[in-house]
Amino acid sequence: LSDPRWALSGAWLDYDRDGDLDLFVANYLEYDEGKFRSFYAASGYPGPLSYNGVSCALYRNEGNGTFTDVTKAAGMHNAGGRAMSAVAADLNNDGWMDVYVANDSMENYYYENKGDGTFAEKGLELGLALGQNGQGVSSMGPAVADLDADGELDIMIPDMDYGSLLSKRGGFYQDLIGSSGL
């Protein structure tokens, strides 16, 4: 794969259930090598949020050692993303791999696999996009497991402050970090 974007992590998944592992790449931001922004204050070093976010990428494994970028066709193109990492799991228990993207200082994305080669972004709709106070947080590396043995995967998301423990309750995710003792 030849991709000039600043990638921070990736997740292998068989999103189309053809038996080949496809690759989701969590891209962070648009960074032009050799081109820097000028800041004049003494503490004015450009931090990551000084640069534009960039879309993640989904590469379909063609089964012959090559991959094809299907990000736009799959409905996963989001030009303003700032992905720190992603995890692939069947979060809605329909047998198809979904993708959860942890973004930096903005809403997180949940791409639900529709089973036809496309995804629908449903993070806000299901309570997976924002922190417990309704704000974007500096999400890092999400991990999934069925922590309460209810048959639904829960998502632990560390961040720069307190983190989130998202558990599905009545069709929506609730942040249980405060009551969990974590």
What would you call each of these model-derived segments?
Residues 1-182:
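Acidic, glycine/proline-rich Ca2+-coordinating loop motifs
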